[in-house]
Swiss-Prot record:
<keyword id="KW-0479">Metal-binding</keyword>
<keyword id="KW-0408">Iron</keyword>
<dbReference type="InterPro" id="IPR011604">
    <property type="entry name" value="PDDEXK-like_dom_sf"/>
</dbReference>
<keyword id="KW-0234">DNA repair</keyword>
<dbReference type="Pfam" id="PF12705">
    <property type="entry name" value="PDDEXK_1"/>
</dbReference>
<feature type="binding site">
    <location>
        <position position="784"/>
    </location>
    <ligand>
        <name>[4Fe-4S] cluster</name>
    </ligand>
</feature>
<keyword id="KW-0411">Iron-sulfur</keyword>
<dbReference type="InterPro" id="IPR049035">
    <property type="entry name" value="ADDB_N"/>
</dbReference>
<comment type="subunit">
    <text>Heterodimer of AddA and AddB.</text>
</comment>
<dbReference type="GO" id="GO:0003690">
    <property type="term" value="F:double-stranded DNA binding"/>
</dbReference>
<keyword id="KW-0067">ATP-binding</keyword>
<dbReference type="GO" id="GO:0005524">
    <property type="term" value="F:ATP binding"/>
</dbReference>
<dbReference type="Pfam" id="PF13361">
    <property type="entry name" value="UvrD_C"/>
</dbReference>
<feature type="binding site">
    <location>
        <begin position="8"/>
        <end position="15"/>
    </location>
    <ligand>
        <name>ATP</name>
    </ligand>
</feature>
<dbReference type="GO" id="GO:0046872">
    <property type="term" value="F:metal ion binding"/>
</dbReference>
<comment type="function">
    <text>The heterodimer acts as both an ATP-dependent DNA helicase and an ATP-dependent, dual-direction single-stranded exonuclease. Recognizes the chi site generating a DNA molecule suitable for the initiation of homologous recombination. The AddB subunit has 5' -&gt; 3' nuclease activity but not helicase activity.</text>
</comment>
<dbReference type="GO" id="GO:0000724">
    <property type="term" value="P:double-strand break repair via homologous recombination"/>
</dbReference>
Length: 1158
């Protein structure tokens, strides 16, 4: 029983001395007494390689490299193991989750959190922590009973103690945890003869838990010798850089005192690891108070980048330089990080440079398609077939892998499901998934081609196959009663899905293609799934359980599964976290993400027991728990020290200036400290360095071409670019080995998002030999030619969703108002409140069920929205009654359609126009309301258009002039053309072109006392004032509002009178009759010009900018046109917005007959 301690700072040869000592013993006596090297799990492979790769060792049975758990198994093999079944991490958490659910009603503090998955995970960690530090439920209960403490702390400890005791009772004599097995290992040590003959070395640790200290105590007591290696100078100052390992040394000294033995200390002071003075100085001076600055010889570098991506790209280039110019191997290089977001970047960037690497970290299986399929399948059952888990299940492609183009079929199914609002048991309604229903998807009328029919039949078949599998799974699970039944049913369902065969086939294909890591993932997924099922049966067996509880517990188990990947090759870059990775004696170590907030990292308590509670526990119960946050914060400098002293030749630090969300990042204070140790240790700003040394960017063929593209693009924009890039372009262009893909990249240099003008034949093929279109189509072209091309040429459809869109709301108001208007023959004056409510209810009952497959009755929200629509309609009818009371114009026609060839007597005839190419233009549409007034054999007509959006309920004459707003002039023109069909007199003249805003008005008041109920109603009605343009004819003015008199401004139409009875410029929107006719004729010419441009093949991405706004803001086709402010701004169209449109139209000479039927 001897105890040795090798003590010294990093790089002083402690581990080398240990390895040399072990090797000498192995050479001297290969079959001698056992030698055990205990190391952290992540270091065992590296240490085994140190023995295997030694050419002087011809093999030996003496030495084993083990971590504590493997050592315990080695002892159990000799003296016999425990009879209990060992619980895995997943099994432990599943059991604790189930206990929490059963004991929820007895919990005092955590009753409301008990249902959350994360709570059971935290509770499991806390119980494991207690076990590591030898704290039992009895300790907790005695502590609670004996001490006065805050109520919250007491309730918390009582809750934890309750679950902990229940857990211990459940596993007693049947199961054992990993921590308990270590306690059993301690008890078995005296029985081991093998241990008594062993020389034990402990290396690579900087701290231990209570249970591990007890193991070390047992090893010291029963083994022949124990040697422990610690990175410390032996300073026990709690503020020392080596506080953590010195704390370990103090514990070892206490153990030695208890065993009444002395520690044979050997101090190591000579630095052996570092090959240059830079690294030696860095190690020796990092923690000194009085700095001794020396000249930096270039073996330490600090890199500053703008972003993480730029940072890792530069690291990759420097690794290539190390391999090519310094003859290093990949295994001589390591990258250490602290920020978890870097792990993703390594996976995305290093393969671009063909750098082999291994990240020493476990990855969750949660996001693997197979695991996502299983978890989605569980959620489908739990959520009663809700749409989101169903779509996630389908998109994993696990249950649909046998279908060709399965992803496309699933996309089509998703479109249909979202449009029809499929959820719950509606998935099982075969009538809903009829092929004919798919033909209407996103389109009002469409005849299926044979190919489309075959595709949709495949979609229906795919959906049916998946539903059959889910139903089978649901049926099997619903018949189960015990956990064993559920596990069996689950496994048999996977067999029914043919999942094992499918996965094995996929694994074999991946192996054949050389993708061994992905193949290994599939093996681990399946084995992990079986392990969880085994654990469930092991832990719960024939215990009765509801299906809901089983699926919850099962999901908890799946959460714990992780990939443990074995390195695919020995020659690869080692990547790990600064806290855990073991990368000793690498030639070059890169420490990335050296920012304040990462190194040092603010340490916050994440366990259920807070730091204050830990301190109270330790003071009052004399029981040590895991370190508190302030202790861990003190050890941050030691983490940095260990990380940066792993290198033999070079160490490179890097940090970024900007976070992933655009926030500013500061340099780590440790880097400022390191920089202060050297003269001439400058921070290298990566962009500036590359600007001065462009050749440094040319390290990898493919990535050089990408950077070359960026340089040439800058050159084309007249930026200063190094001549080296032009030389590089010529070299790459002329090299058959390097120029692959160069032409494709270069084509992007001149990309300006320019579309191709369609030829005459193609235009006719796309748009037909005549244009049959609504007014909105022409307005859409004016907004942007490409928008028109995408919607009417390519006929692209945005996915229709089962939700109320703005245009749906507008359609509802139009339909409801038409229904009511026809019922009362347009006589709004006769309405009273009772009649308004009655008609509104009738109209809504008739119309709402037809909207979006009865969408407005699908949920409580939409039923509430239906009531809000009713309220808006009632307010609107009150406003219409008010307006009708004071107007001589009478509403006569509602939702009146027009087209070239009317289908009924009620429809109006639209005059055919002709493009410059001779193509007929047939305009069709629907006029919301036509009001008429007749005096002296002359009929005057108002066009009333209902708008549910305030922005569109305004007539902008500048837009009318430029053809951006064509609707009202078109409608008036149609009405004037159809006097006979409308039953008007021979002389028909325009009255008003007016918008009615259907909405729920809001009135603002400063205080409740300002509200006058009678005035409030009047103010609300006035919010419905019509807007637009009115004929200045006195007959029209008088008829629009019979109350008009001098100094009066109408609250129903845009007309006001001055004192002298003349029209007020401020309160009136009027034009004389001739001007209105000119606008109508000019509108026709705009139609002809627009249609001619369409048939001329114009498809430019050229939005019309008006009042500093672009139509792109609300355009559905941005993902198609790729409009870009930098590239396309030169093609933005504008108009002269300063014109007076009435004066402009009056200056145009238009030869046409005004008035009457034109």
């Amino acid at each position: 029983m001897t105890l040795h301690a090798y003590l010294g700072r990093a790089g002083t040869g402690k581990s080398t001395k240990m390895l040399t000592e072990i090797k000498q013993k192995m050479k001297a006596d290969p079959l001698g007494d056992p030698i055990i090297l205990i190391a952290p799990t992540q270091s065992t492979f590296q240490l085994e390689q140190a023995f295997v790769n030694d050419p002087e060792l011809n093999g030996s049975l003496r030495t084993e490299v083990l971590h504590f758990e493997r050592l315990s198994h080695r002892i159990f093999q000799e003296v016999g193991s425990y009879s209990e079944q060992k619980l895995s991490k997943a099994a432990t958490e599943m059991m604790i989750y189930n206990i929490v659910q059963e004991q929820q009603k007895y919990l005092k503090l955590y009753q409301s959190q008990a249902k959350y998955y994360g709570f059971s995970e935290k509770l499991t960690e806390q119980i494991q922590d207690f076990k590591k530090y030898a704290v039992t439920p009895e300790h907790l209960e005695h502590f609670i009973a004996d001490k006065n403490m805050q109520t919250r702390t007491k309730n918390k400890l009582e809750d934890i103690a309750l679950i902990y005791r229940e857990f211990e009772q459940r596993i007693q004599n049947e199961f054992i945890t990993g921590e308990d097995s270590l306690q059993y290992f301690i008890d078995c040590m005296p029985k081991s003869e093998w241990l008594k003959r062993a020389d034990i070395y402990i290396d690579g640790f900087h701290n231990f838990s209570t249970i591990e200290y007890l193991i070390i105590k047992g090893l010291i007591k029963y083994a022949k010798s124990v040697t422990i290696i610690l990175t410390t100078d032996g300073n026990h100052d709690q503020f020392s850089l080596f506080r953590k390992p010195s704390e370990v040394l103090r514990h070892i000294e206490e153990i030695a005192n208890e065993l009444n033995i002395s520690i044979e200390r050997q101090y190591f002071n000579q630095l052996y690891r570092f090959n240059n003075q830079d690294l030696k100085h860095l190690e020796q001076e990092f923690d000194v108070l009085q700095i001794n600055r020396v000249a930096c010889q270039g073996h330490i570098n600090i890199l500053e980048s703008a972003t993480m991506r730029e940072e890792i790209n530069e690291i990759a280039r420097r690794i290539i330089v190390d391999i090519r110019d310094k003859q290093l191997r990949y295994q001589d290089i390591a990258i250490l990080y602290r920020d978890e977001s870097y792990a993703y970047l390594f996976d995305s960037i290093l393969p671009l440079y063909n750098i082999p690497y291994n990240i020493d970290t476990k990855r969750s299986m949660t996001h693997h398609p197979v695991m996502e399929m299983i978890r989605s399948l569980i959620e489908v059952i739990q959520s009663n077939w809700q749409v989101n888990p169903m779509l996630r299940l389908l998109k994993t492609d696990v249950l649909t892998a046998s279908y060709l183009k399965s992803a496309y079929l699933v996309d089509l199914l998703e479109n249909f499901v979202l449009e029809r609002g499929i959820y719950g048991k509606r998935w099982l309604d075969d009538e809903l998934f009829n092929v004919e229903h798919f033909s209407k998807m996103g389109r009002k009328a469409h005849k299926l081609t044979e190919d489309e029919r075959n595709t949709f039949e495949q979609v229906v078949k795919l959906k049916k196959d998946v539903i059959d599998k889910i139903l089978h799974f649901e049926k099997q699970m619903s018949q189960a009663e015990t956990v064993k039944d559920f596990a069996t049913a689950f496994y048999e369902s996977m067999e029914y899905f043919e999942l094992p065969n499918q996965l094995m086939t996929e694994r074999d294909e991946l192996d054949l293609n050389g993708n061994h890591e992905k193949a290994e993932e599939i093996d681990q997924i399946w084995n992990g799934l079986i392990q969880i099922l085994d654990d469930l049966v092991l832990v719960f067996g024939d215990e009765p359980m509801s299906m809901e509880r089983f699926l919850e517990v099962f999901d908890i188990g799946l959460e714990q599964l992780e990939f443990v990947m074995i390195p695919q090759t020995l020659d690869q870059v080692s990547i790990g976290t600064m806290d855990l990775a073991k990368v000793d004696n690498k030639q070059h170590v890169f420490l990335v993400g050296m920012n304040d907030g990462t190194m040092p990292q603010p340490v916050t308590a994440s366990s259920l027991i807070t730091d204050e509670e830990k301190k109270y526990f330790e003071q009052q119960a004399n029981v040590e728990l895991s370190p508190t946050s302030d202790i861990l914060q003190m050890d941050e400098a030691f983490v940095c020290y260990i990380a940066m002293t792993r290198a033999r030749q070079d160490v490179t630090f890097s940090y970024r200036l900007m976070g992933s969300s655009g926030d500013d990042k500061e340099i780590s204070p440790f880097l400022n400290q390191i920089q202060s140790l050297f003269n001439q240790l400058e921070i290298t700003n990566i962009p500036q360095y590359h600007e001065v040394n462009p050749l440094s960017l040319m390290q990898h063929a493919k990535q050089t071409k990408i950077t070359l593209f960026e340089a040439l693009r800058a050159w084309l924009y007249d930026e200063i670019v190094a001549d080296s890039w032009l030389d590089a372009y010529q070299v790459i262009r002329d090299s058959d080995h390097l120029n692959q893909g160069l032409d494709y990249l270069m084509s992007a240099l001149t990309f300006d998002n320019e579309t191709v003008k369609l030829g005459e034949t193609l235009s006719k093929d796309l748009y037909g030999k005549e244009i049959n279109a609504s007014v909105s189509r022409f307005e859409g072209y004016q907004q942007c030619p490409f928008k028109h091309y995408a919607s009417h040429g390519l006929k692209l459809n945005e996915r229709t969703k089962y939700e109320l869109q703005n245009f749906d709301l507008g359609d509802i108001f139009h339909s409801v108002l038409k229904y009511i208007s026809e019922r009362i023959n347009g006589d709004f004056k006769q309405l009273d409140l009772k009649k308004i409510r009655q008609l509104t209810n009738e109209a809504l009952e008739e119309i709402l069920p037809k909207v979006q497959f009865n969408l407005l009755n699908s949920s409580a929200y939409y039923r509430y929205l239906s009531r809000r629509i009713g309220a808006i309609v009632e307010t609107t009818l009150s406003a219409l009654k008010y307006q009708g009371t004071y107007s001589k114009f009478m509403p006569k026609h509602f939702e009146t359609s027009f087209r070239r060839k009317p289908r009924t007597n009620d429809e109006l005839i639209a005059q055919t126009l002709t493009t410059t190419q001779g193509i007929p233009i047939n305009i069709r549409g629907q006029i919301d309301r036509i009001d008429t007034y007749t005096k002296n054999d002359t009929s005057f007509v108002n066009i009333i258009d209902y708008k549910s959006s305030e922005g569109s309920a305004t007539l902008d004459l500048t837009k009318v002039y430029y053809g951006m707003q064509m609707q009202m002039m078109t409608y008036m023109d149609i009405v004037l053309q159809n006097k006979q069909r409308l039953g008007l007199t021979d002389i028909v003249k325009p009255g008003g072109l007016l918008y009615f805003h259907v909405h729920e008005p809001r009135i603002k008041f400063k205080s409740w006392s300002d509200i006058d109920e009678d005035k409030l109603e009047q103010d609300l009605i006035k919010k419905f004032k019509l807007s637009g343009l009115v004929n200045a004819d006195q007959t029209v003015i008088d008829a629009l509002d019979i109350r008009l008199e001098p100094k009066f401004t109408s609250d129903i139409v845009p007309v006001g009178l001055n004192k002298d009875g003349s029209l007020s410029k401020r309160g009136s929107q009027v034009a004389d009759e001739a001007t209105i006719y000119k606008f109508i004729q000019h509108n026709k010419e705009n139609f002809i010009e627009t249609a001619s441009n369409i048939m001329d093949g114009h498809t430019e991405v050229a939005p019309l900018k008006y009042k500093q706004k672009l139509p792109c803001a609300f355009c559905s086709y941005q993902s198609v046109c790729h409009v870009d402010g930098m590239i396309d701004s030169k093609r933005y169209r504008t108009v002269d917005e300063t014109i007076n449109p009435i004066e402009a139209i009056q200056n145009i000479n238009i030869n046409d007959e005004f008035g009457g039927e034109q």
